[in-house]
Regions:
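Active-site nucleotide/adenylate-binding loops and adjacent lid/helix of ATP-dependent enzymes
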Residues: 56-58, 63-180, 188
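A long amphipathic alpha-helix within ATP-dependent nucleotide-binding catalytic cores
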Residues: 154-168, 208-270
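Beta-strand scaffold of nucleotide-dependent catalytic cores
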Residues: 107-109, 181-197, 206-211, 271-276
């Protein structure tokens, strides 16, 4: 309880700083995590490259693509409407959500959320009156989050109009507590490798992580294991739709120096998750320094420095 209150107290001045001086905010947060300042003039690794891109390049296109509702139009424009998870609706007010018309099970998401505490699986058959009251309060809180990018200097979120979306709930694989999330790192339109999240906890934060190449070779040596980000005891099975995932990622990432294309595999099909431009705010601590440098080099070769 005290930790939550402290976070709330600290968040306000930090949010103000993030809105008015995002470079200072980023430097301070990076220093707190890595005990050194980032090289923003000549980035050397993927973290520093992401920080550079979000602070010093045109990110106006990111806003539509970071919006979980608006990005659906982009996916359709790229000829991939068939990989969109069926949508039940999108609403700007909680009172407008027709819960009685929705199926027994579905998932709710904040269109401007990062998935950590801003999505909720709903099973109407298990909901009490108190549960419905709590759910509506939670959704109202999501809609009140209008400056979520300020704390990390992420400009793409400031222009998103908050909404609640409801989607079909995809079935999970046997032995998994959540859908396996296949995240493809793409640099200048070319897929590079997979970051795979499995057995994600309900809090949205704790998850098993794995690094795989495009041939599904497993590379635990590229990861830093922690209590929050453990590794699976064994490599995950090769996805049935591996080649299709790579094709989809290539199509969706075309034209961007760096983006992570997040996909699911369910019922023998590829499904779109989201596009992520600022993974962990550009402060990833689950990759080794060497692997971060290797990935960063794929991006920086073709960038024009402006700092």
């Amino acid at each position: 309880m005290f930790a939550d209150r402290l976070k709330h107290i600290v968040a306000k001045p930090l949010s103000w700083l993030g809105e008015h001086s995002p470079v200072t905010m980023v430097r301070l947060r990076y220093l707190a995590r890595f005990h050194r300042l980032p090289n923003l003039k000549h980035p050397k690794d993927l973290n520093e490259t992401i920080l550079y891109l979000k602070l010093f390049t045109d990110t106006s296109a990111w806003t539509r693509l970071a919006d979980k509702y608006q990005v659906r139009q982009y996916v359709t424009e790229r000829g991939l409407a068939d990989i969109l998870i069926p949508l039940y609706g999108a609403w700007e007010r909680v009172e407008d959500i027709p819960f009685g018309e929705l199926p027994d099970r579905f998932i709710l998401k904040a269109n401007n959320g990062d998935g950590k505490g801003t999505n909720r699986v709903v099973d109407k058959t298990q909901m009490s009156d108190a549960d419905w009251t709590d759910l509506k309060k939670e959704l109202q809180r999501w809609l009140s989050l209008r400056h979520i990018g300020a704390l990390a200097g992420e400009p793409q979120y400031s222009g998103i109009r908050p909404m609640i979306i409801a989607e079909q709930l995809l079935p999970t694989d046997v032995g998994q507590s959540s859908l396996v999330d296949y995240k493809l790192w793409c640099f200048h339109g070319e897929p590079h490798s997979f970051l795979v999240c499995s057995n994600r906890k309900e809090n949205g934060h704790d998850t098993c992580l794995g690094c795989y190449d495009l041939d599904w070779g497993y590379h635990p040596e590229n990861m830093v294991v922690s209590a929050r980000y453990p590794q699976e005891p064994e490599p995950l099975p090769r996805p049935q739709c591996l080649e299709e995932m790579i094709r989809v990622a290539r199509v969706l990432s075309d034209g961007f120096p760096e983006v992570r294309v997040d996909l699911y595999e369910s019922q023998g099909r590829v499904w779109f998750g989201e596009l992520t431009f600022t993974s962990l705010c550009g402060m990833m601590n689950y990759y080794t320094p060497g692997y971060l440098r290797e990935m960063g080099e794929r991006v920086v070769e073709s960038l024009e420095w402006r700092v």
